[in-house]
Swiss-Prot record:
Gene3D superfamilies: Vaccinia Virus protein VP39. NCBIfam families: 16S rRNA (guanine(966)-N(2))-methyltransferase RsmD. The lineage of its organism: Bacteria, Pseudomonadati, Pseudomonadota, Gammaproteobacteria, Enterobacterales. It comes from Buchnera aphidicola subsp. Baizongia pistaciae (strain Bp). Specifically methylates the guanine in position 966 of 16S rRNA in the assembled 30S particle. GO terms for molecular function: 16S rRNA (guanine(966)-N(2))-methyltransferase activity; nucleic acid binding. It comes from the Bacteria. SUPFAM superfamilies: S-adenosyl-L-methionine-dependent methyltransferases (SSF53335). This is Ribosomal RNA small subunit methyltransferase D. Its EC number is 2.1.1.171. Belongs to the methyltransferase superfamily. RsmD family.
């Protein structure tokens, strides 16, 4: 008997504002892929001034669908670098970039932790939304600091599970700018201040 493989369910979310407003981004239903909701993305980008975004090179450390990186360039960020390890997620991300003729989103298939061990350049805005119930967030923050991935006054967005006594404690020189929470998710925006 032939065993049929279960196909990944594909849904989509939309770009909220800017150059690619209302464009749909495909989302595959696969392990550890948990795209930031439209509501949370809208809140996040309302926290960041348009002037800041337009001058920024962004890094999305656990890109998944690429929604955060694409939203940033839609709002005229200079560039976004998206790091993702899952092959299917990369396939659909590259497909939407081609469809929308986006050339300033750079997609890298890599293990984020390993990639951050090799310093490359500093970024203005960093998105951190790793899979829940892992130590990835803690490891990523340590590497961002150790290897100077953050420019002075860089903004760091963190999305984590809203679990009592398990929220990450940020570095002393990261100033909390904004935070909100839902029943399951705690999300916050920090500023890196090197001369703190």
């Amino acid at each position: 008997m032939k065993i049929l493989k279960k196909k990944s369910k594909i849904t989509s979310i939309q770009i909220i504002s800017g150059k690619y407003k209302n464009s749909r981004i495909p989302i595959i239903n696969t392990k550890n892929l948990r795209p930031t909701t439209n509501y949370i993305r809208e809140t996040l980008f309302n926290w960041i001034s348009n002037e800041k975004i337009k001058k920024s090179h962004c890094l999305d450390c656990f890109s998944g669908s690429g929604a955060l990186g694409i939203e940033a360039v839609s709002r005229y960020a200079l560039s976004s670098t998206c790091i993702e390890i899952q092959k299917k997620a990369i396939f659909f991300l590259k497909k939407i970039l081609i469809k929308l003729s986006i050339t300033n989103v750079h997609v890298i298939r890599a293990n984020t932790i390993q990639w951050l061990k090799k310093p490359n350049k500093s970024y203005d805005i960093i998105f951190l939304d790793p899979p829940f119930k892992t130590t990835l967030l803690k490891q990523t923050i340590a590497l961002l600091i150790k290897n100077n991935w953050l420019k002075n006054n860089a903004l760091i967005y963190i999305e984590q599970e809203n679990t009592l006594n398990k929220l990450i404690t940020p570095p002393n020189n990261w100033i909390l700018k904004k935070e909100k929470k839902t029943k399951k998710i705690h999300y916050s925006l920090y500023m890196n201040v090197n001369n703190f």
